[in-house]
């Protein structure tokens, strides 16, 4: 079991903890598939809702909040039945707008894993307005059920009435609908090709600034992040922040980053290169490789 879970596992009921420990191996990064979840429910003799709430301390252990020291965990349950953990991330010494919220982390985890819809969001603190707006961008976002400890469950529409969302800007295919944009690039570099593929899957209906970041560690492992825009603009999630959140969930340190690539469209209304460098340079003493590509 990873050291970061030693403290949080003691907060779980013993039967659930005993069933969960084998899953918390060195490669565990917060994903539990539907079959594994069913086995946890059976072994613990708890309801699924009780298990999901009980797992929040495990999700919170994925957090990296050096500024607030406030650990927030979130669990997104997909239509597939799989669950995806996420946690808040703050960049040390940097402006707060670089922060990743736990709900954003969990949703990006699900998105990168190929999930097509989120049906439940379990979180250990009430979602802030930023996260409510971010969730509203998703497929059937208003129908996502929000679960909080010691509170009744409610739909997102309860927390965000009279919501402004994609349809108000004539976007009919919201976040998590699979979007594929083709780009032209002649490269044999696997890391660049990976970034190109993820840029094609990014979500940028408001600026067409399709983009992705891939980070590589010294052992050759890669961690990606895609751009995810929002109808309210400010809650958009930048690809570098998503990639850093992804890396952190996998229990890797910023100091292990040896290479960073940003691929973005030449036809976007904005460029993400400045914001990407702003997030990278405080955590890794490397240069960003910036590649601009043309849509096919």
From Swiss-Prot:
Matches recorded under SUPFAM superfamilies: Cytidine deaminase-like (SSF53927)
Keywords, in A-Z order: Hydrolase, Metal-binding, Zinc
Disulfide cysteine pairs (residue numbers): none
Free-text comment on the cofactor: Binds 1 zinc ion.
Gene3D superfamilies: Cytidine Deaminase, domain 2 (3.40.140.10)
Enzyme class: hydrolase
InterPro entries associated with the record: APOBEC/CMP_deaminase_Zn-bd (IPR016192), CMP_dCMP_dom (IPR002125), Cyd/dCyd_deaminase_Zn-bd (IPR013171), Cyt/Deoxycyt_deaminase (IPR050202), Cytidine_deaminase-like (IPR016193), Cytidine_deaminase_bacteria (IPR020797)
Binding site for substrate: 88-90
Record-listed E.C. numbers: 3.5.4.5
Positions of the CMP/dCMP-type deaminase domain: 47-167, 186-296
UniProt cross-references to Pfam families, sorted A to Z: dCMP_cyt_deam_1, dCMP_cyt_deam_2
Active site residues per record: 103
Binding residue positions for Zn(2+): 101, 128, 131
Cofactor needs: Zn(2+)
Gene Ontology molecular function: any one: identical protein binding
Gene Ontology biological-process entries: cytidine deamination
Keyword Metal-binding: yes
Catalyzed reactions per annotation: cytidine + H2O + H(+) = uridine + NH4(+); 2'-deoxycytidine + H2O + H(+) = 2'-deoxyuridine + NH4(+)
Cellular component annotations (GO), alphabetically ordered: cytosol
Keyword Zinc attached: yes
NCBIfam families referenced in this protein's UniProt entry, alphabetically: PRK09027.1 (NF006537)
UniProt family annotation: Belongs to the cytidine and deoxycytidylate deaminase family.
Assembly with partners or alone: Homodimer.
Functional note: This enzyme scavenges exogenous and endogenous cytidine and 2'-deoxycytidine for UMP synthesis.
Name of the protein: Cytidine deaminase
Highest classification ranks of the organism: Bacteria, Pseudomonadati, Pseudomonadota, Gammaproteobacteria, Alteromonadales
Gene coding for it: cdd
